[in-house]
């Protein structure tokens, strides 16, 4: 089934790619000599097939080297082309508006298709460059949650997507950033591993996460990616080799101060209801839930805080719009990013630390969340 979806996705991609190629061709028509128009389409076709094909081969087989490099270049080119078309359309709309107020011949003489193309290229390169920088220079978002005279510093990371195709994630830098915050507790909010555990560099992952320093330890939950490619037993066995405690619809008490509840991802068929996990111990508690749509359940059961990820805030602009529409239609909420408060309850959806597929973030920097949890 997964293979079929990838094949259908590839066909849909290629059809969309041809459409993009046609739009760019129309913009360049006045400057492309007739003899080179066939060459243009040959180049466009080769790029459109080779790069995504390399992406698929590398993703399924984890082949590295030139295959992975070509695939990663393909994602970057695709992002560039998407923005090229987007900016081209915006500039054409601006041009049409100008033509309503300025003599048409003046506008056409001074602003032609080729100039629109050049400006679109500049803007596209700029936003793709910003996206690379945003991924590799994470922000630290500080929030307050809970109530009381005492507090714990809880550092949260979601959607690391370790070993995602083409990933340039540096775990050593990530751990250093975590330790610099001097956390009491560290939480990994799912999609820590991108796909098949057997295909990742286990030694690199284990060595680095075991260097995390926190007063009360490191806790993790599953995301949809871990569960899609691995069984629960495989995930548990892997985490047992680390200093990270995996919570699978479980509750843990931290020094008789607070409780942490870690939920299995929403996609898991046998996931428990939250009220089945909560014990009678009268302590303030927070909920780790990879997908955010069950935040109302946490509110209902009296949680002080819920931390989630999954949405990436769309990762690439303007994909936060269809993501918001999807959540509105499926879960009756527009809430896909940032903080939500109601009474004493606080929920936060992080943009995530890593990236999937496109190794860039044009919708905001990658993120580490530092929670001042009061109890």
Name these PLM-found stretches.
Residues 144-375:
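Soluble catalytic domains of enzymes that build or remodel membrane lipids, polysaccharides, and related
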Residues 1-135:
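Non-catalytic terminal accessory segments
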Residues 124-148, 164-169:
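Hydrophobic alpha-helical transmembrane segments in integral membrane proteins
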């Amino acid at each position: 089934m997964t293979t079929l979806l990838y094949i259908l996705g590839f066909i849909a991609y290629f059809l969309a790619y041809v459409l993009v190629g046609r739009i760019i061709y129309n913009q360049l028509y006045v400057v492309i000599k007739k003899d080179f128009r066939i060459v243009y389409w040959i180049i466009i076709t080769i790029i459109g097939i080779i790069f995504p094909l390399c992406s698929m081969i590398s993703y399924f087989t984890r082949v590295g080297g030139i295959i992975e490099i070509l695939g990663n270049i393909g994602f970057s080119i695709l992002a560039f082309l998407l923005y090229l078309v987007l900016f081209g359309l915006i500039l054409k709309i601006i041009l049409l508006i100008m033509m309503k107020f300025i003599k048409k011949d003046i506008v056409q003489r001074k602003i032609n298709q080729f100039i629109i193309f050049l400006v679109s290229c500049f803007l596209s390169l700029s936003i793709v460059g910003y996206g690379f920088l945003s991924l590799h220079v994470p922000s630290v978002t500080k929030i307050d949650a809970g109530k009381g005279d005492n507090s714990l510093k809880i550092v949260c990371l979601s959607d690391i997507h370790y070993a995602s195709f083409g990933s340039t994630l540096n775990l050593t830098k990530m751990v250093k950033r975590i330790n610099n915050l001097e956390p009491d507790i560290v939480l990994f909010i799912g999609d820590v591993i991108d796909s098949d555990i057997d295909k990742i560099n286990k030694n690199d992952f284990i060595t680095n996460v075991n260097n995390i320093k926190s007063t009360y330890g490191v806790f993790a939950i599953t995301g949809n990616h871990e569960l899609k490619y691995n069984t629960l037993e495989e995930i548990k066995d892997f985490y047992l080799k680390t200093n990270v405690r995996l919570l699978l619809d479980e509750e843990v008490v931290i020094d008789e101060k607070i409780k942490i509840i870690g939920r299995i991802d929403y996609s898991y068929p046998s996931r428990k209801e939250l009220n089945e996990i909560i014990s009678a111990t009268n302590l303030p508690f927070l909920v780790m839930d990879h997908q955010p749509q069950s935040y109302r359940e946490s509110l209902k059961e009296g949680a002080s805080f819920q931390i989630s990820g999954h949405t990436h805030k769309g990762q690439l602009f303007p994909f936060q719009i269809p993501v918001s529409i999807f959540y509105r239609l499926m879960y009756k909420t527009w809430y896909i990013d940032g903080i939500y408060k109601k009474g004493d309850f606080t929920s936060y959806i992080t943009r995530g630390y890593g990236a999937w597929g496109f190794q860039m973030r044009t919708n905001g920097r990658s993120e580490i969340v530092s929670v001042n949890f009061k109890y």
